């Protein structure tokens, strides 16, 4: 049990310094004993010790014992990165009755021993500098208290693909009211377009549709389709969200999905669900298993002949329907916006969009699907005949620095082999060739799937990225490539070429990212707070990531991450409140002139002007210090990193006499 905290700031600093060996990480390079003895001579240092692992229970107990017996009111631990163990040591000193913010970390591992392994003497001197600077700051530390904010027990899931569906179901099953916003007329995401899933070749819609139905019928889920998030204000526990629901021109409450309106509509248009290779009507139901099972009118094609209105017995057609603005308040947000397939038209050498029989992997998926535009038949777009020779090209839009996409999309190798196998199942006499750079069969059952492609199906693999695809007068295609295993240039003719396109962030993701205030990684996908320790969290508290929104992944990984995001989002909602760390910016209202420079620069929107001076919302502030550095009047300061504390560290670093 923690003892009652002391009134530390009015007392003379009594500092304890604890130098950690971190096994051989620090102790194998730095002379720990020399650093320990040096620290003991610094002003206000009462005790200086070393131990092999201070993060261990015995190490922490030693620190707590000294706090109680020696009356320490400041603690400095010289060890690894505060990103790893600062919470550990804060908790340690707090349990001994000391305010957790009267603790300072000196990083002797990442900032010293790991970067100076070849210079032990220099590393030891640098360790002394780092400890001296930490002690200088520790003298000026102030006790701080965390604040708490209440958390609304409702959640918002953005995106209706398999990741969004899993997240929403998990949260709803926990008892939380969950809003799901999907920009398309129906949920399903990309998984709904697939015929089979690798490596088990399960029917994609067979395993997805029951979950879609569960979403539509769940008492705790409010499904808002054909809609987009337009504004997000607030902070963890108290987000205010504005959603724009586009007009379907069909009343969802009245429509039964009977399809009568679709039958009588005289206007055809490209079917987006079939990737444009099939046609649908100007009034359409995206696919038979759609949730909600409701028609939508596309006004870009509708001629308002009113035949749909006349045939509808329930009067569900509403040609005068207007966009609807919906406002909700939620405690947490999960972003599961999925991906778009790379558009290969910029790869001019492959002729997509110019060569009739060059198609993408997703277009082939719709061909292979029994409910697709060709009723499951694989045909050449040029003449509708079955192809006798088919080539697949891997890594189109992936692992390609020339187009700014150096990352691996992680699913292309497997979905190409899956579709190659399905073609052989449908047309055993068809020759299938795969052009690849490397086969990345990393998942459970993937290597066996790869071997089956070679051994059972006799699919040919050529290692090399094709240089170009040429269209011949008879509309066959010549693929010119280097075979890197044979060390020669090859040219082979095919009836159809399928481009294995990679995954890219979906259209509109950048606008949504800015609306919510998230970061993105170099590949354009949304960035997690930490790739290993916080893979579903973001730097915006209360906002989480699921599925391909965070980066390319297959269906099992997307579902697993979705459940992880739901579990993380549930934590603050279960607790009903969250603790806000007090390392935030503060304003001296007597000095602030209300110039608003800080407002323009704050990346988290945490500052507003109230009564003529800046006011910081501590729930939004992340303590980045941007406003402090920019304030022209010096009115902004940051708790735990106050100007006088930083200056004390600088002076200690430059103090040659102390060295």
UniProtKB/Swiss-Prot annotation:
Its UniProt pathway annotation is: Cofactor metabolism; coenzyme M-coenzyme B heterodisulfide reduction; coenzyme B and coenzyme M from coenzyme M-coenzyme B heterodisulfide: step 1/1
Q: How is the cofactor bound?
A: Binds 4 [4Fe-4S] clusters per subunit.
Top-rank EC class of the record's enzyme = oxidoreductase
Task: Provide the residue positions that the database annotates as binding [4Fe-4S] cluster 4.
Answer: 602, 621, 624, 627
One Pfam assignment: Fer4_10
Recorded GO MF terms: 4 iron, 4 sulfur cluster binding; metal ion binding; oxidoreductase activity
Q: Which cofactor does it need?
A: [4Fe-4S] cluster; FAD
Entry keyword annotation includes GTP-binding: no
- Enzyme Commission no: 1.8.98.5
Top-rank taxon: Archaea
> In Gene Ontology terms, what is a biological process of this protein?
methanogenesis
Binding-site residues for [4Fe-4S] cluster 2, renumbered to this chain: 265, 302, 305, 308
Q: Where does FAD bind?
A: 159-182
The answer to whether keyword Transmembrane helix applies is no
| UniProt subunit comment | The heterodisulfide reductase is composed of three subunits; HdrA, HdrB and HdrC. It forms a complex with the F420-non-reducing hydrogenase (Mvh), which provides the reducing equivalents to the heterodisulfide reductase.
Which family is this protein grouped under? Answer: Belongs to the HdrA family.
Primary role? Part of a complex that catalyzes the reversible reduction of CoM-S-S-CoB to the thiol-coenzymes H-S-CoM (coenzyme M) and H-S-CoB (coenzyme B).
Query: What is this protein called in UniProt?
Result: H(2):CoB-CoM heterodisulfide,ferredoxin reductase subunit A
What gene, per UniProt, encodes this protein? Answer: hdrA
